[in-house]
């Protein structure tokens, strides 16, 4: 279809980073849409993002707010996420110490990655979009290693119903 100019790009949307390797082994894709957020370094540490960029594959990041969880106050976060209270404490302290909002940190992290071509966000109204655009400008402070997690129960929202 690409050769016939019926389509310009072939892409996939994945939910789990493990799906990506199998897709790349079997298909010639132009872009991948994937979950990416400030707590999750798996794609960075595995060099998967670099490999995608080197292959000329566009990366579109979604769920940069971890389905809104990163933006919730401690009072509004559902109790089932309390098992990560240590991580939430580190997150909150880092935000306070660096005088940055959760929105600013989450969006700036995603757009600061040179391997990421586009960042997709969902909004309910124009004001939210304006707020995200404004938050995207500015410096992202260094992120401490203790703020990263590989806990798939937290990082993959499809696991949240079992919590």
Sequence positions of predicted segments:
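Beta/alpha (TIM)-barrel catalytic core signal, keyed to glycine-rich beta->alpha loops juxtaposed to Asp/Glu
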Residues: 1-155, 159-162
